[in-house]
Amino acid sequence: MQDSKIPGAEKLRVLLVEDNIFAQRLAMSTLKQIGIANLTVAKDGADAIGILDRSQITFDLIISDWNMPNVSGLDLLKHVRRTWENMPFLMLTGNANEDFVITARKNRVDAYIIKPFSAAQLQQKISALFNIRTT
């Protein structure tokens, strides 16, 4: 990918929620590669809810793993939708089977991406969420 930066990405405030440290580091690296500079990381869904409830800022995007212990990505999505109805939410999953897709759509996930993913795939999903032309 020649120019992997998303125009205006440096202004986006992103909350990344991932319980697997290796997947978390990969996602952080990929987000930085596409130009996300303002990144807050939560180690799981419960941590994310705490960050959201305490935060003085509003995030522009939440990127969350689906399968996490205690507070799942679905539980986090439901919490977010109760308070921030229109906040863009990108779900990460290792298994996008039919049940996942139906449940995600029913709960108004904005987009999802299957792990492992490339910088180009993440760039495309985020660009589409914000209607940003990258070519």
Label every model-predicted segment:
Residues 68:
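Receiver (REC) domain active-site loop signature in two-component systems and cognate sites
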Residues 18:
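Conserved acidic carboxylate
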Residues 44-47, 72-75:
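Acidic catalytic/metal-coordinating carboxylates
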Residues 36-43, 51, 113:
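Short hydrophobic/Thr-rich beta-strand motif most characteristic of the beta2 strand and flanking loop
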Residues 28, 75, 96-111:
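Alpha4 helix (beta4-alpha4-beta5 surface) of REC/receiver domains from two-component response regulators
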